[in-house]
Swiss-Prot record:
Residues 140-154 have a biased composition (Low complexity). It is a multi-pass membrane protein. Glycans are attached at residue 88. This is Transmembrane protein B169L. Belongs to the asfivirus B169L family.
Length: 169
């Protein structure tokens, strides 16, 4: 499995164990809801003495069971939403940190690369031309004008001069 995914699951487990409202070590929210419901029922029976009459006892038992089921669903719903929020936040943290580690190389800051200018691209795309044959001996005067097209030698692309075997095949 992916190491980032496993690290994210471990991080999520730590956040579930330290759930703020309940501070519980149970991972299953249904068990937590059951414990909270049991505590509520104990308090309910401690405050309200159960009736002695058998008919009233049955009605009270039905109401108590309805209350138990309602409280279970309520606690499960609340806990489930809290755990989903925790999962979504930690999952997003894992995604952001894995993207940061993958493309930025950890804490290392990489400066942005500026795109090359248009003039540089045009110069690089066209091969440089140099005259074929040996260079004339002696220094060239600075104010001399180029020879006419009839006197000049044909220009050969620079790549052919440097690596002729690559282009002749």
């Amino acid at each position: 499995m992916n190491v980032d995914f496993i690290a994210g699951i471990n991080n999520l487990g730590e956040k579930i164990y330290t759930c703020e409202p309940f501070k519980t070590s149970f991972q299953n929210p249904f068990i937590v809801a059951l414990i909270i419901t049991a505590v509520v029922l104990v308090v309910f029976f401690a405050i309200c003495n159960p009736p002695v009459d058998k008919k009233r006892k049955t009605k009270t038992a039905i109401y108590v069971y309805i209350c138990i089921v309602a409280l279970l669903f309520l606690h499960y719903y609340v806990l489930n939403h809290q755990l989903n929020d925790i999962y979504n936040k930690s999952n997003m943290d894992v995604i952001v940190s894995s993207i940061h580690d993958k493309y930025k190389g950890g804490d290392e800051i990489i400066p942005p690369i500026s795109p090359p200018s248009v003039s540089n691209e045009l110069e690089e795309d066209q091969p440089k031309k140099i005259p074929a044959g040996p260079k004339p001996a002696g220094p060239k005067p600075a104010d001399s004008k180029p020879a006419s097209s009839a006197d000049s030698k044909p220009l050969v692309p620079l790549q052919e001069v440097i690596m002729p075997s690559q282009y002749n095949n």
